[in-house]
């Protein structure tokens, strides 16, 4: 079967009136066909080699730019297959096969596939944008599309986030690009915002010095920018102080809890009251009227 197919393939290089040729003419045609096949194979082999070489060069160059490994691998594979398609078309042209119809067929197929997979292609485009513009990296804390957690992986079609309660959430890249992205560790430092309410009867300077003592005792609080401790507002039931220290972004959640607890302990130690809203309810009893009931 294979021999017959090969024979038909060789016969395609000959004209329809092959049997009218003499032996020398047939020999010349066979040599010409063999040379075309050899040149086509050479083009194909060179194409494989150059495609692989170009893939390695692109991957090596992209690794120096600190891009995500997922994008580097994707770019390398795309360059490899695109160049391979070019050499395959050249190989067919060398064999005398009309490539214009083949290119048109490939174009139509690409269009049909694109229309069928437009959602997936949008996710691919989103993945490329995420990596190129470096909105976030693997291991960073982000919040997007109502999901908050640590980035586990950035793939071509989707991004996986591990929430704080250890759930894995996979979000399509198209949805990420179309929503606001909050990167909690995008900057080296981050500010903790605490509102501490104390009673109106408390001495303001005493409260401020107590809060400052708590901040000074924590060596992980940044000295630059300097922390802010100020009377922020007079509330309905408390005097509210704004406590705003700066910490390393990766320590934000842990230090926020530590400082909140330390402030509560210090205020208790200094007998500084922390009021809470109270509501007094006054009941007004209506006056009762005596009714004369007369017997009928």
Curated annotation (Swiss-Prot):
The keyword Transmembrane is assigned to this record: yes
GO molecular function, one term: mechanosensitive monoatomic ion channel activity
Classification via InterPro entries: LSM_dom_sf (IPR010920), MS_channel_1st (IPR049142), MS_channel_C (IPR049278), MSC_TM_helix (IPR008910), MscS_archaea/bacteria_type (IPR045275), MscS_beta-dom_sf (IPR023408), MscS_channel_2nd (IPR006685), MscS_channel_C_sf (IPR011066)
Superkingdom as given in the UniProt entry: Bacteria
Topology in membrane: Multi-pass membrane protein
This protein's UniProt keywords: Cell membrane, Membrane, Transmembrane, Transmembrane helix
Entries under SUPFAM superfamilies matching the protein: Mechanosensitive channel protein MscS (YggB), C-terminal domain, Mechanosensitive channel protein MscS (YggB), transmembrane region, Sm-like ribonucleoproteins
Family, similarity comment: Belongs to the MscS (TC 1.A.23) family.
Protein name per the record: Uncharacterized MscS family protein slr0639
Native organism: Synechocystis sp. (strain ATCC 27184 / PCC 6803 / Kazusa)
